[in-house]
Design a protein with these regions (language model features):
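Kelch-like beta-propeller repeat domains
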Residues: 1-104
Length: 104
């Protein structure tokens, strides 16, 4: 028995191609949140229909950070990363939180 999957493009507009970004699911608001990567330190949300850029201000640009959802506080937590992907000595140790409206 084999399965056949059919993919459908849901949105024509969204984040530019990138790598080194972080992405996590925000359960309280049922959104996928994408931050940063190689291109820009911007924040995007996917609501199962469309991508929306939601924040221009926030953590400085970085690659390879980690982001998880804290269910008890209903916030996304972003940690670390590097300023230059080819220079791990430029590692960051800061922590940021996304509450669905702004980074702090």
């Amino acid at each position: 028995m084999s399965e056949r999957w059919i993919w459908t493009q849901k949105a024509d507009i969204g984040p530019s191609p990138r790598y080194g970004h972080a992405m996590a699911y925000e359960a309280a608001r049922q959104r996928v949140v994408l931050f940063g990567g190689e291109v820009d330190p911007n924040t995007w949300e996917w609501d199962r229909v469309a991508w929306t850029q939601v924040a221009d201000m926030g953590p400085p640009g970085r690659w390879y950070c980690a982001m998880v959802y804290d269910d008890s506080r209903q916030r996304l937590v972003l940690f670390g990363g590097v300023l230059q992907p080819d220079n791990p000595s430029r590692a960051l140790g800061d922590t940021w939180e996304w509450d669905g409206t702004e980074w702090t």
